[in-house]
Regions:
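Sec-dependent N-terminal signal peptides
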Residues: 4-14
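Positively charged, low-complexity terminal tracts
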Residues: 19-186
Length: 186
């Protein structure tokens, strides 16, 4: 009886291991998550419908009053953008390199600007079309620096802030996840 239970357990683990390598299309697989100042930040992998795989850094929920963003014509419009994210790359090595380059930005002068490939997460939970986001080094209110990511879509503009401690925490989470689940990472 023990032999059959052990064989069933090994078979179940084999199936789980194979399925862990094949991420379903359009599904977000969380690697790490952290909260700061009432904002949630996360690191996740995502596979597009065309088969493109990538690591993404969620910059937190978009804070808007009732989901509205200012518009020049109507002065108010509704958008279904829930959160913004930037692409870290298609492999774990690219993701680590991008996280390291983001950490290096905190040592740059104020108002230094860099562009990142970003994507907005819509109300359906799926990533939208790739867009360029601008990252600007800003002074923190208490001291130190933080990064402001600005996403522009037509006349609309959404901005989010990223503290240094969040990047360090999520980099550590990625490092741990790569050690715990090496077959899930490319």
């Amino acid at each position: 009886m023990k032999k059959y239970l052990m064989m069933a357990f090994v078979a179940m683990m084999s199936v789980a291991n194979v399925s862990a390598q094949n991420i379903p299309v359009g599904m977000r697989m969380e690697i790490g998550e952290t909260e700061r100042d009432k904002s949630e930040y996360s690191l996740f992998t995502y596979k597009d419908e065309d088969g493109t795989f990538g690591y993404y850094l969620s910059l937190g929920r978009v804070t808007k009053i009732l989901g509205a963003i200012r518009d020049d014509i109507t002065d108010m419009s509704f958008d279904d953008i829930r959160e913004t994210s930037i692409c870290l790359g298609g492999t774990k090595d690219e993701a680590f390199a991008t996280l390291d380059s983001i950490l290096a930005l905190y040592n740059e002068e104020l108002e230094t600007s860099v562009e990142f490939q970003g994507r907005a997460v819509t109300g359906s939970g799926r990533l939208g079309e790739p867009a360029t986001s601008q990252c600007v080094v800003k002074k923190n209110l208490v001291g130190g620096k933080r990064l402001q990511f600005i996403f522009t879509s037509g006349k609309r503009q959404v901005s989010t802030y990223l503290p240094k401690s969040v990047v360090k925490d999520l980099r550590r989470d990625l490092k741990i996840d790569v050690k715990l689940h090496p077959k899930q990472h490319r």
